[in-house]
Swiss-Prot record:
A single cellular component GO annotation: cytosol
Protein name: Glycerol kinase
Classification of source organism: Bacteria, Pseudomonadati, Pseudomonadota, Gammaproteobacteria, Aeromonadales
InterPro entries for this protein: ATPase_NBD, Carb_kinase_FGGY, Carb_kinase_FGGY_CS, FGGY_C, FGGY_N, Glycerol_kin
Domain of life: Bacteria
Binding-site residues, glycerol: R85, E86, Y137, D245, Q246
Record-listed ATP binding positions: T15, T16, S17, T267, G310, Q314, G411
Organism, scientific name: Aeromonas salmonicida (strain A449)
UniProt pathway annotation: Polyol metabolism; glycerol degradation via glycerol kinase pathway; sn-glycerol 3-phosphate from glycerol: step 1/1
Amino acid sequence: MSAEKKYVVALDQGTTSSRAIVFDQDANIVGTSQREFTQHYPKAGWVEHDPMEIWATQSSVFTEVLAKTGLRSEEIAAIGITNQRETTVVWEKATGKPIYNAIVWQCRRTAAICEELKARGLEEYVRENTGLVLDAYFSGTKVKWILDNVEGAREKAMNGELLFGTIDTWLVWKMTNGEVHVTDPTNASRTMLYNIRDLKWDEKMLDELGIPLSMLPEVKPSSEVYGYTTRGGGSRIPIAGIAGDQQSALFGQLCFEKGMAKNTYGTGCFLLMNTGTEPVRSSNGLLTTVAIGPKGEVNYALEGAVFMGGATVQWLRDELKLIHDARDTDYFASKVGDTNGVYLVPAFVGLGAPYWDPYARGTMVGLTRGANRNHIIRAALESIAYQSRDVLDAMQQDSGIKLAALKVDGGAVANDFLMQFQSDMMHTPVVRPTRIETTAMGAAFLAGLAVGFWKSSDELEDKFSVDREFIPQMSHEERNKLYHGWQKAVERSRRWAEED
């Protein structure tokens, strides 16, 4: 490797913004650039993005970050891509023009298609072979919808004139001027079209959904040189890493070993546990998905999502007006020794794993005349930790692995009260890294390893530093008593919106 190749760039294409982050050889951030883009809601429950706007924002932040840092393309060793998963783009092979907006992972328009597939008895097949639940969340039914609803699309697809990709595939196609049509196993495993056991596109699912194989990208390892771009002006830069956002965060947290887990605390919480080289089937409603091993090879993970994490704090701020800033919660929660018996179950949109109850609704129980603002704020923070424990307990049950420590990232990890309570509630150390940009770091690591910028995953271990480790301090009796109260509160919230 030439001595002047001093940096790796991660392109982090998210649900609301596109970012570019430059890392040096010590995994320090040298520069960042970010641009938001438009969310389109054409009907209730529908969510779309303009693929050309995604490309424009992602391309411009890359150019911007080089300009801001004064770096030349010759100094960039490689580019890694991490992306919002499941979001679906279909475009014309000849022109590179999308035939419809990108259908976003949050979009519910294909729920009826999923119900039809369930009626045809496909639920068990999907679970067993793709690791997923039959839901509108995943890409497969979104592709079918586009082929069924865009005029002439199905005919063009059958003639080999259309291409499909998740956002990673779309970006690589654009960056290589249409030369490379590729994805990685982590993104492929979120399409409902990929067999996670055989590690290839699943012909039965393609047949059931009427999707020709010719539309699909080639699946290549998450750490490999896929092609080159001249977007930075000047020399060709290798595009050498791809991973879906949550798997990228797992890799960025160096969760390479079986049983290692991370929790990303954002609007919701995403928990992933590496289960090693064999897929583990969940009996608790968790997803089985592809993760990445230390050499970029396929590993597997269990994944569970908590719908309301940071969103619960936003509710305290925006609707109840109990706080002015999310950062205030640490202060108010620490002013009282406990919640005075108050539990908040933030089932505002139902409950996710392991309950899967769309009819659950937000509930506050245990209120007495002595309950005050501090107790309610504390109960809201505690609810994030309780829900995370629900998922982690399910993971430990499914995998038979006792968690040694939980690595954490995302905005809410700055809240010391929440991190300590999380550790207490799970009776497990919680490890907060110094650098919390772990999603982008994962993509940078994958790209850097592919081109020899970093020699091995062992070298990456030296780049990982811990800001603080939270050690459990709560007694066994106290923890059990509090968690039992939470379970009772959850029961009160369940099936609330069901029609009598």
